Amino acid sequence: MNTIDNNNAAIAVNSVLSSTTDSTSSTTTSTSSISSSLLTDGRVDISKLLLEVQKLLREMVTTLQDYLQKQLAQSYDIQKAVFESQNKAIDEKKAGATAALIGGAISSVLGILGSFAAINSATKGASDVAQQAASTSAKSIGTVSEASTKALAKASEGIADAADDAAGAMQQTIATAAKAASRTSGITDDVATSAQKASQVAEEAADAAQELAQKAGLLSRFTAAAGRISGSTPFIVVTSLAEGTKTLPTTISESVKSNHDINEQRAKSVENLQASNLDTYKQDVRRAQDDISSRLRDMTTTARDLTDLINRMGQAARLAG
């Protein structure tokens, strides 16, 4: 059995402790107090010592692997929570966009219905006004026509009566003049009466002409009122609403299409962001795995170097013994 003195073993253990890293020094420091099972008559069993050191190294590597795996699992849980939060935000945005689209469609439909109701109301009001104006104009025209007809008939009757009276008076005057020249005073009275009747007929004709002129002026005023109605603001508003009704469906369809395009772009940008975050997470996981593999290789190399050092120390101790 290969053994060395206690002093040489203490020197070898101290050199091993000084050559290892901080993580291994704390572990191997506990081996400085060698159990009594490794001591044989004041000497140390090198083989058992090497086995204990290898066990400690394996435990150290296992502990480090467990720690790194826990760190990786914790990082994965964090990334998973982030992704779930992003997915929840995406779902909420999609739901909000859908609700906004539905609300916009409902508002558009209500606006269309309101516009049609306003147009119908304005059209009905305009038609009522036009009908009332037409009825008033027709009544006025009928009144004027009737008054003109009556006035003309009255004037004609008056003129005819006057002519008849004048003719009768003239006949009577001629007859009276022919029968008796002595009745000059009676003829003069008849002539005066005829002249008075003629003047009355002339006055009635003048009144009829004046009334006809008044009716003609009333007709011209109604014609001007109809022209003002056609050029008034309500009439222009109704015309504008009728023209706007033609372009309203096109405007609504363009608005809905624009909202749909905006929602699609927003969803696409969110999906691109999620894909970018997933790629970043995969790269982080790959770097962490590479780092773990590199550290494990370094630890394996360190353990191999330590084993070689201990073997050389054992060989040196055997040669010295």
From Swiss-Prot:
The chain crosses the membrane at residues 99-119. It is found in: Secreted; Cell surface; Host membrane. It comes from the Bacteria. It is a single-pass membrane protein. Keywords: Host membrane, Membrane, Secreted, Transmembrane, Transmembrane helix, Virulence. One of its GO terms (cellular component) is host cell membrane. The core secretion machinery of the T3SS is composed of approximately 20 different proteins, including cytoplasmic components, a base, an export apparatus and a needle. This subunit is involved in the formation of a pore, called the translocon, in host membrane. Component of the type III secretion system (T3SS), also called injectisome, which is used to inject bacterial effector proteins into eukaryotic host cells. EspD and EspB are inserted into the host membrane where they form a pore and allow the translocation of effector proteins into the cytosol of target cells. Necessary for intimate attachment to epithelial cells. Belongs to the SctB/EspB family. This is Type 3 secretion system translocon protein SctB.
